[in-house]
Amino acid sequence: MVSTNIENRILDKIITSNFTKRELKVLLLIMRFSFGLNRDFAVFDKKDFFLAGILPYHVDDILKGLVVRGVIKWNPDKQMFGINKNLKEWIDRKQKADQF
């Protein structure tokens, strides 16, 4: 049986953060295709977020919001997505973040 290894400190931070349902689905999808394949980044098209039930017209807003808050790293040119492991850079929704 294969498993996805996620550091407890990352899970703890996700649990204690105020993410929307869509943001959580995006994070889980990125973790599955990065950590689940023993990689730091997942590589897939934005249309693949439909696997998590995210409609295409929501994807950009969700990704930009997570990038602005420092939760994910995103290279739009290469379609690479990764969880920012430096949890000190994460900004809670309650804190003010500069817009993308």
Where do the PLM segments sit?
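Short, amphipathic alpha-helical interaction segments positioned at domain boundaries
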Residues: 87-100
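Winged helix-turn-helix DNA-binding recognition segment
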Residues: 13-17, 22, 33-89
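Replication-associated primase and helicase/ATPase modules
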Residues: 1-3, 72, 94-95
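Surface-exposed, interaction-prone regions with an acidic/low-complexity signature
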Residues: 18, 25, 97-100
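Long, low-complexity, charged/polar intrinsically disordered regions in eukaryotic proteins
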Residues: 1-14
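Short, leucine-enriched amphipathic alpha-helices that occur as contiguous helical runs
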Residues: 7, 23-27
